[in-house]
Amino acid sequence: MEFNGNLNHMEKRKSGYVTQKQFNEYKDSNDQRLIKIETTLAAQGEQISQLVQIVFLQGKQIKELQAEQKAQRVEFNARMDRFESLVLKSLESIGNTLTDFGKRFDSMETRLDSMDGRLDSMETRLDKIDPPK
């Protein structure tokens, strides 16, 4: 059946017969829902586009941070190498100083042994000159 300008004209529907006016109201209601859905989808599409831009920006920032981190790691490693070198030089210097002190102590010990020997010799002479009573 077709619409012939009569608002009371009936059309066959699965749920029964409806008037053209009811059909148009239903159609208008559906059109409004579709418009609302389209508006919502458009807004969500815009939000998705904004989120994609944010993700791209964050990806760029991550790459920049990774490059900065790599540069800092290289600088840190260079500083650690320099620090290790300075520590090794300091330890070597301390070792040399301790070796020098050891040599000096050995020399002093030799001198003291020599002096002790001389004192023993002097005591022996004195004992010969003036024997103990």
Curated annotation (Swiss-Prot):
Highest taxon listed in the record's lineage: Bacteria
Family: Belongs to the UPF0134 family.
Protein name as it appears in the record: UPF0134 protein MPN_151
Source species: Mycoplasma pneumoniae (strain ATCC 29342 / M129 / Subtype 1) (Mycoplasmoides pneumoniae)
